[in-house]
Regions:
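Short helix-coil-helix linker/hinge
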Residues: 53-59
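Short amphipathic alpha-helical interaction segments
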Residues: 81-97
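Ferredoxin-like iron-sulfur electron-transfer modules
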Residues: 123, 285-292, 296, 313-342, ...
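Catalytic cores of enzyme domains
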Residues: 160-325, 359-365
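Short acidic, hydrophobic short linear motifs in intrinsically disordered regions
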Residues: 68-80
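A short, conserved structural fragment
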Residues: 93-111, 348-349
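Long, low-complexity, charged/polar intrinsically disordered regions in eukaryotic proteins
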Residues: 2-47
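Short, amphipathic alpha-helical interaction segments positioned at domain boundaries
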Residues: 110-164
């Protein structure tokens, strides 16, 4: 199973004299249950991740807040009993820039788009994932030549390891309990729009164009925290970490105002989505904020995406399940192999139609956690390689996967 990377060591892990306020803040953000960090120590990722960049002064403010509860500035003044409002505002700005805090402007949207102008800014203490653990990895500096860099990760590479740990340790042993749709915890895969546009019954929320039109007044593109984190840990791919992940609505404003993203329009967002499809990336959204609300669209590479890892590594597809299930009609299938090659989850493989002396070859169905006990023996640590297996051990007719010319000849 994935272990803590040795590529980004933090001096705060296993500190003999841990900072009490940071321990307390780690417990607060983790939640009441605290599993698996109920007895928080300096060895735990919530501690050393926060200790890397969060000051005690910031912790004092955050500890006054409830997780995922919005507060206006006047409410923050009352909450913290601040005598110097200018100093508090500066501190809130710093916490927002780091990603310890998020903020919105009242969320004035319905099915058709914006319903009212932005109202007063509301500060929110997010959970770790999705939330501060990934926002810590997002910092965008634009150089004179137009190139981009991430000064925060360059100075604090351990933040990449922090994000990785917070997408693994808290979920281990839990993912099999997640129902279809992710229950607000996982990411929801949105299929390529061209693949569902002919279906009159498809819901608006299953179309990326719907979400982009809904939030058309506020769209931004920012750095992919998964790609950035993996690159720091030297497990990345050749993808550019910038200009893939799209923020919408108030979150788009937050990205731009805190230096984590760049404003774009609807047309540019659609170009990014098309480019992602051309590269074989997976579109994902999250419904953590409630029904008919999203804050972003991720264009995910299965080799580096932590959300897809959660479903693939733990072998629990509900974590990222789409509302659509692809099915193959054996009679109509000509074994062209396209679905096998394109599916990032390795959901289909090539088999053979030719019968054996005992009749047609029977292929096993994928085991699901809904019907079996689910332990580490069911995990697939080699999911990246497993998903690239194109055919069953029995072989395939046609033998496209082995043919030097890559030609499918139906057998």
């Amino acid at each position: 199973m994935p272990e803590l990377s040795k590529e980004a060591i933090t001096p705060h892990k296993d500190e003999k004299n841990p900072r009490k306020k940071i321990l307390k803040l780690g417990k607060l953000i983790t939640g009441d249950g605290g599993f698996p960090f109920s007895k928080m120590t300096s060895a735990d990722a919530p501690y050393w991740g926060l200790a890397e960049i969060v000051s005690d002064e910031m912790a004092d403010v955050a500890l006054k807040m409830k997780v995922r509860t919005p507060y206006t500035f006047s409410e923050m003044v009352q909450l913290t009993k601040a005598d110097d409002e200018e100093k508090l505002q500066k501190l809130l700005d710093e916490m927002s820039q780091l990603g310890l805090l998020e903020y919105d402007y009242g969320y004035h949207y319905d099915h058709n788009g914006r319903t009212a102008p932005k109202s007063e800014r509301r500060y929110i203490l997010p959970m770790f994932v999705p939330g501060s653990a990934e926002l810590f990895n997002m910092d965008q500096k634009i150089h004179e030549d137009g190139s981009l860099s991430n000064p925060r990760l360059e100075e604090h590479p351990a933040l990449g390891a922090f994000f990785e740990r917070m997408t693994y340790v808290p979920l281990k042993g839990k993912t099999q309990l997640i129902p279809p749709g992710g229950a607000g915890l996982g990411m929801h895969v949105i299929p390529v729009e061209k693949a569902i546009e002919a279906h009159n019954t498809s819901m608006d929320i299953e179309h990326l164009s719907y979400w982009l039109k809904k939030y058309e007044d506020s769209i931004a593109v920012g750095q992919c925290s998964c790609r950035s984190s993996m690159a720091v840990l030297k497990e990345g791919v050749a993808d550019d970490a910038y200009n893939w992940c799209i923020g919408v609505g108030d979150f788009a404003n937050y990205l731009v105002e805190t230096g984590k993203g760049t404003p774009i329009d609807y047309e540019e967002a659609m170009r990014i989505l098309q480019k992602a499809e051309d590269n074989g990336f997976v579109h994902q959204i999250t419904n953590i904020d409630g029904e008919n609300k999203i804050f972003g669209i991720c264009n995910c590479n299965v080799n580096v995406c932590y959300a897809l890892r959660s479903s693939q590594l733990f072998n629990t597809p509900n974590m990222s399940r789409s509302a659509y299930t692809a099915k193959v009609d054996p009679i109509k299938c000509v074994a062209c192999g396209k679905c096998v090659e394109y599916c990032p989850a390795g959901a289909v493989k090539l088999g053979q139609k030719l019968c054996t002396k005992d009749g047609p070859v029977q292929y096993p169905k994928h085991e699901l956690p809904t019907i079996l006990g689910w332990g580490e023996d069911k995990y697939d640590e080699n999911y990246r390689d497993s998903n690239r297996i194109n055919c069953y051990d029995t072989g395939t007719a046609p033998c496209k996967t082995a043919c030097p010319a890559h030609i499918a000849v139906q057998g």
